[in-house]
Curated annotation (Swiss-Prot):
Subunit description: Homodimer. Interacts with SufE and the SufBCD complex composed of SufB, SufC and SufD. The interaction with SufE is required to mediate the direct transfer of the sulfur atom from the S-sulfanylcysteine.
Name of the molecule in the record: Cysteine desulfurase
Gene3D superfamilies on file: Aspartate Aminotransferase, domain 1 (3.90.1150.10), Type I PLP-dependent aspartate aminotransferase-like (Major domain) (3.40.640.10)
SUPFAM superfamilies named among the record's database cross-references: PLP-dependent transferases (SSF53383)
Active site positions: C364
One of the GO biological process terms: cysteine metabolic process
Residue numbers carrying N6-(pyridoxal phosphate)lysine: K226
Organism this protein belongs to: Escherichia coli O7:K1 (strain IAI39 / ExPEC)
Length: 406
């Protein structure tokens, strides 16, 4: 299949709009990606003609909605090559998925004196839940330090493991630096020390294929909204043996087998015991449409196109005076930068005047900002619908800002 970015862009209605009188150049997909018509229409069609509460309903609409929901679980399992659809839990997003693991598996398996390993490049969603768990139980949080080029000091990792290490929680791809971590060797090392591994895949699954069986990770979590799907829906993968042992962390409808005021409550089996309450069925339907859309394009095709675009962007940005880039040469999805001594917010505001949308701030990665000794960065992210012309506009915009501000 020949990849046509023009055909892809035609599926995204928002990309035809203007901002400040100029065509929108949306370079903020790492924060949240735009949605194709196929996703918008699938969710709207469900609410127009197919909506009902799922599970236990005897009527046709409920049965059909349940079938559609569970078919998305199956599609998602194929998308990441899980052994079974029953290894996947629907969550609100990556953040909830990590908190679920921390509050269910973590509360049951991490004790005083144990330790958890994370890295200095993590998103707050893969830091704060582990800080909270360690504070609750008296465990230690250990950190893999960064190199200046945005890679991890992996030579330090063996020294962080010991017989008390219970978990390695690591990002697949940094949301700021674009660094893709060498998961295979990290996971092997963790398992050699008897530790489990959680992978934050929020910035990976849209850029290339992910195979959780090949990785052999114990947990893998990602969000739908960065994968061209709706907000408020994501996937937590857990190896089946682990998932069946984990207790629920939220109580309510749908996650019970029996409820008795005198004899207490028993839980239904996983994954449904982790899905208390009425689910975001519309979001699940939209996620299914997003998975179908991306799969039809082919993740390998997307990866090839995006990597060519990334190489072009990095080469063109070399022409911008006083531009500092953060992260390795080989990266996925994002380019973080600062322009001279100007605050990222000012640079981002000027770019917005030119119709260019980038993200500014600490990117939910304050420890990483502290490492580079900056309060904030600009971040341009490249997705499957971005073009070489949009990269040229970014470069021209930065050159113009440099001339204006000095």
């Amino acid at each position: 299949m020949t990849y046509s970015v023009d055909k892809v862009r035609a599926d995204f209605p928002v990309l035809s709009r203007e901002v400040n009188g100029l065509p929108l150049a949306y370079l903020d997909s790492a924060a949240s990606a735009q949605k194709p018509s196929q996703v918008i229409d699938a969710e709207a069609e469900f609410y127009r003609h197919g909506y009902a509460a799922v599970h236990r309903g005897i009527h046709t609409l409920s049965a059909q909605a349940t079938e559609k929901m569970e078919s998305v679980r199956k599609r998602a399992s194929l998308f990441i090559n899980a052994r079974s659809a029953e290894e996947l839990v629907f969550v609100r997003g990556t953040t909830e998925g990590i908190n679920l693991v921390a509050n269910s598996w973590g509360n049951s398996n991490v004790r005083a004196g144990d330790n958890i390993i994370i890295s200095q490049m993590e998103h707050h969603a893969n830091i704060v839940p582990w800080q909270m768990l360690c504070a609750r139980v008296g465990a230690e949080l250990r950190v893999i330090p960064l190199n200046p080029d945005g890679t991890l000091q992996l030579e330090m990792l063996p020294n962080l493991f010991d017989e008390k290490t219970r978990l390695l929680a690591i990002t697949h791809v940094s949301n700021v630096l674009g660094t893709e971590n060498p998961l295979a060797e990290m996971i092997t090392l963790a398992h050699q020390h008897g530790a489990k591994v959680l992978v934050d895949g929020a910035q990976a699954v849209m850029h290339h294929p992910v195979d959780v069986q090949a990785l052999d990770c114990d947990f893998y979590v990602f969000s739908g909204h960065k994968l061209y799907g709706p907000t408020g829906i994501g996937i937590l993968y857990v190896k089946e043996a682990l998932l069946q042992e984990m207790p629920p962390w939220e109580g309510g409808g749908s996650m019970i087998a029996t409820v008795s005021l005198s004899e207490g409550t028993t839980w239904t089996k996983a994954p449904w015991r982790f899905e208390a309450g009425t689910p975001n069925t519309g979001g699940i339907i939209g996620l299914g449409a997003a998975l179908e859309y991306v799969s039809a394009l082919g993740l390998n095709n997307i990866a090839e196109y995006e990597q060519n675009l990334m190489h072009y962007a990095l080469s063109q940005l070399e022409s911008v005076p006083d531009l500092t880039l953060y992260g390795p040469q080989n990266r996925l999805g994002v380019i973080a930068f600062n322009l001279g001594k100007h605050h990222a917010y000012d640079v981002g505001s000027f770019l917005d005047n030119y119709g260019i949308a980038v993200r500014t701030g600490h990117h939910c990665a304050m420890p990483l900002m502290a490492y580079y000794n900056v309060p904030a960065m600009c971040r341009a992210s490249l997705a499957m619908y971005n073009t070489h012309e949009e990269v040229d506009r970014l470069v021209t915009g930065l050159q113009r800002i440099h001339r204006l501000l000095g």
